Amino acid sequence: MRLLKKLIIIGLVVGTMMGIVACSSEGASNNTEENTTLNISAAASLQEAMVELEEKFKEIEPNVKLQVNLGASGALQQQIEEGAPCDVFISAGEKQMNALEEKGLLLEGTNKTLLTNELVLVESEGTEIKDLDKLTTYDINKIAIGEPESVPAGKYAKEVLDNTNLYDKVKGKLVLAKDVKEVLAWVQQGNADVGFVYLSDAFAAKGIKIALTTDEDTHSAINYPIAVLKESKNQNKAKAFEDFLLSDDGQAILENYGFKKAN
């Protein structure tokens, strides 16, 4: 009888200890999940939208933190190629994403078109431009565009000027910015008379107005691709974030900031 009691007590003690170990393991697992960080490299034009997207994604994945790195798509591409930590890349141009694809840096099947945009000419208060030909007149001294080699918006702007036979006439007035946000700031601050930016950048900007929207046939299609990086240490969570951005909820948020749903 005493032996039976001892065996029962030992069994209870062992069971309790196993329960404690299981709870500890579960707690450690939860803590690890809480510390999951996704590094997102995104085009500068997504700055405002990313704030709301991050908040909404937090409701879906409360244990995931987003570390967002904003900049010119070309600069972000170079950082990724040089080994900078990145789980998800969102580019404002296909050229940069295709370069990473060709180097085998993207997770297979994740390179998708996230959204589209429009290119507009913005002007400072007091400037009146009805058509692009006005850029050649004496009262327009500085035209801001992104650096065409590294800033997709700058590439599109140069295409517009080339295809309307204006580039040679206005190239002496061009001032090149490191990204599209700097173009917008220069016009807002009066450091440039006009500038080419995305519709999403001008959408709620103060101190400027949209002079005109460029014709789609004067520049390449403005598509924003998204992809998960092959070297991501959190591929499942990265794919979950990509899926969220492509979902109806993610697309609705992006549309609120002037972006358009990809066809």
Please annotate each region the language model reported.
Residues M1-G27:
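Sec-dependent N-terminal signal peptides of Gram-positive bacterial secreted proteins and lipoproteins
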Residues C23-E55, G74, Q78-E81, G93-E94, ...:
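Exported/periplasmic ABC-transporter solute-binding proteins
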Residues L38, V64-L66, L119:
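Conserved beta-strand core positions
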Residues E55-Q67:
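Signal peptide-proximal N-terminal region
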Residues L70:
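Conserved strand-loop elements at the edges of beta-sheets that form or border functional pockets
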Residues D87-S91:
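Periplasmic-binding protein-like
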Residues L105-L106:
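Basic phosphate/pyrophosphate-binding loop/patch that engages nucleotide-derived ligands
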Residues T110-N117:
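Short, glycine-/small- and polar/acidic-enriched structural segments
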